[in-house]
Amino acid sequence: VRPARDGLKVGGHQASCASAATLLTALYMDALRPEDRVAVKPHASPVFHAIMYLLGRQTQEKMQDFRALGGVQSYPSRTKDTNDVDFSTGSVGLGVATTLFASLIQDYTLAHGQMAEGVRKGRMVALMGDAELDEGNVFEALLEGWKQKVGNLWWIIDYNRQSLDGVINEFLFTKIQDFFGTMDWNVVTLKYGKKLEAAFKGPAGEALMHWIDECPNDLYSALTFKGGPAWRDHLKRDLRGTSGLNLLLDSHDDEGLHTLMTNLAGHDMESILEAFYAADQEDQPQCFVAYTIKGFGMPLQGHKDNHAGLMSPEQMAEFKEHMKVSDGEEWDRFAGLSSDARELSNFLETVPFAASGERRHNSPKVHIPQRFETKPTERAATQF
């Protein structure tokens, strides 16, 4: 933990990082190839840099200088960061729209035989926050993509249903399905993790699924923050008289019940990879609506004010203990993990994304003459 010597906030958006961590891990550790290009949502920058650190593409010194001069950037930046940032991202959803136009440009260069030798066609990917759907340029890009029949494009929505402005409207997901479907996208909803899917097949399972589907976003977030006893109280009250309810609740202690009720697909690696594999096609753009929890696994999870919140030193100490990371091991790549370090190193060396070295390609410079000659005529028009 870096001290705040002047009392000002130091650190990023921890809750936003937590909601996107599994999605980014699935992308960079499995789904992506070196030729793919990704726009990472700006508030998930620390997760991106951590993945690059694991892959040996980021230094400890720059990580420790996060948000400081010369350190890794709070928003991914192609000009200020030194690692594999494909698109600079920031406010108003510009990174999201850029991926769509990058896909169109790639199609153009291929169609005109202008792709450089040895450069393979890649997929364009954007990991976006649900609040980025408030930005008009995202919808302008959607319409342009429909006009040009864009393909080979993934937009992954980190649907944690919380933003700086408050809790997302209950029915936003239906609108997402409508307007993406209207633009000829394939919409894939990732809502339930494998534990919840298994519970739905057991005692009171159908009633449990209906309760989750009907639970308002603000209540779900509040229960996520309060934990197991709060889940139990609400389920007992709301599902009173449901056959099998006692059997369902009695089979989980408070911690286990909380784990079950927060098992959303956006935090379930198996569910995410299944969806990515099933959508591995180029001819149609793909929209993944991944249900997540803002602050997942943190003491801030679900809290209404967690957008820019930071864990206190005491909370961070408890978090490190929970993750089995001892003092002094914070920068050990495999701290807290029970797997053999050699196996983990071998895995990282075989990650498809990192299979080749340099991912940046420099185009030849276009010569610009010192002076543009013009031929004056008696009559000229400004309209062409």
Locations of regions flagged by a protein language model:
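Short internal beta-strands
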Residues: 38-41, 152-160
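Cofactor-binding active-site loop characterized by glycine-rich and histidine/acidic residues
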Residues: 8, 14-148, 169
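Conserved internal helical-beta-strand scaffold that buttresses enzyme catalytic cores
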Residues: 1-12, 18, 36, 42-45, ...
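Long, well-ordered, tryptophan-enriched scaffold segments
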Residues: 159-377
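Structural signal for hydrophobic packing residues in well-ordered secondary-structure cores
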Residues: 1-3, 27-32, 52-56, 67-70, ...
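Generic beta-sheet signal
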Residues: 36-38, 122-124, 153, 284-292
